[in-house]
Amino acid sequence: MSDNTRILVRNARDQDISTVTEIDNEAFSPYGTAEKLETFQRRLNIFPDGFIILVTNNEIAAYGCSEKWLQEREPGLDEDPQATHQPEGRILCITAMAVKTKYRGNGYGLLILDKLIEIAHREGCKKIILETTHAQGLFLKRGFKTVHTRTERGISLDVMSLDIESFGSKA
């Protein structure tokens, strides 16, 4: 990313959801794990502080969304955030995160991840959990460990976690 590129990371808004869905489809359709617009809208309504976007060149370039859980468990594809999010939970699940293809390689994925780690700290979470089909390297850069690999609907998913109590207070 060039020194004069303006970047803003902010909470998502209702009007951002269609673009977030497009980015998600671009990133995850090849893996069979793309989300529906309605799912993103529910996530925003349920936990707006856990749903962020990165804007550059007046365009949404990346997003990340999350929810809080009471107990550690495996994420599942197509879960309803109204059923799974628990405001008093101390485990942050990164439910989806992607960078638009033309903006990859600029460090935007790490910026989104760092902000989600910061949100987990602010929310009093002790652990972050996620599953990924192909971005293991990104999460390993921030200390995530692969818990195991599972298969759902024929899709191989690495379940990864980060103990943020030992991670430190800086994302």
State the predicted function of each range.
Residues 7-20:
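A short beta-loop-alpha structural element at the N-terminal edge
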